[in-house]
């Protein structure tokens, strides 16, 4: 049986089970709304550096936030994926689903992924259907990214050691209508972090958490 056939069979017979504690309940407990900031841009543009500093500032404010870093994810959850077009798509599909779980759990997720293709980013936006999803384009020229090259990856890619490397031997499609642009060739790190924090304060954190009654608990075991 093919993989696609197995997936269709599982999808047909697996039933979603709702929790008795909702996302809204968790947001009320946390005293803030949850949501996803999706940082896209070339390697070395500054995505993870900015996101981790934003996370630290949110932590100081007692706001629950978590960074998903593209390299870190490939050490575990996505360690079986490469960098072909198909694997890149699956890499982002998995992250979108995990991000949804974290957002449902009440977190502000800061996802840092090159995510070079517009259709993949559009898929992620559609999965959240406008539900506190915001795309942040961390903009930086390929020349500047090569100059920075903190991991030495561009050097290897230019020498042909690393294939399918975004910006060198694989394309990066710039966002056409991102929710926020951070140009790290123009803005310093402190200003970049503050810009994201200000953006959060006017979007995800601006909404008032509203109360609701908890889902009635079952009186008997059903499964």
Describe the residue ranges of each PLM region:
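Extreme N-terminal, non-catalytic leader segments
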Residues: 1-36
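Small-molecule kinase domains that catalyze NTP-dependent phosphoryl transfer to phosphate-bearing small molecules
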Residues: 139-195, 202-218
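Hydrophobic anchor at the beta1->P-loop junction of P-loop NTPases
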Residues: 39
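Conserved beta-strand scaffold positions in the cores of enzyme catalytic domains, especially
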Residues: 67, 133-137, 179-181
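Conserved substrate/cofactor phosphate-moiety recognition/catalytic segment
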Residues: 52-97
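ATP-dependent NMP and nucleoside kinases share a basic, alpha-helical "lid"
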Residues: 76-83, 87, 99-158, 164
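The conserved Walker
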Residues: 43
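Conserved lysine of the Walker
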Residues: 47
